[in-house]
Amino acid sequence: MWIACNLKGVPTFVWLSAKKSSHVAKLVLYNSKGYVFVTDKGPWYRKACRELNCGWIHETFGGRNVVERWFKHIKQRMKGFHKRFPHNAKYETVGLDLPLLFSLDHSTPLTLNLAISKFWK
């Protein structure tokens, strides 16, 4: 899961992918529409930022924690689902829209529209 947040902690872009690569990082950064990105030390970010001609700051703690809070929140909310979906569930049986009933302030529901093609499987 890729999440791009602004400095206020509001997600600007969410993407699900099967792997981490500079191609996927470039897609996420491009759609986030930022000028400078604060990321962890993943090697795919540096290449993607260089190709997009945008700034890149490596940060282990600090402002990047905005995104880490989202991941913690998502993991907590999804803990109960591991018993609901069998390990051999098919893409067709899960569906295209996965509603996640949470937000940063717990007031507005968010929906992740999964745009997964055969390329991403």
Curated annotation (Swiss-Prot):
Superkingdom of the organism of origin: Bacteria
Keywords tagged on the record: Plasmid
Listed PANTHER family: ISH14-TYPE TRANSPOSASE HSIRS44, PTHR39967
Entry's family note: To M.jannaschii MJ0017 and MJ1466.
Name this polypeptide is given: Uncharacterized protein aq_aa24
Native organism: Aquifex aeolicus (strain VF5)
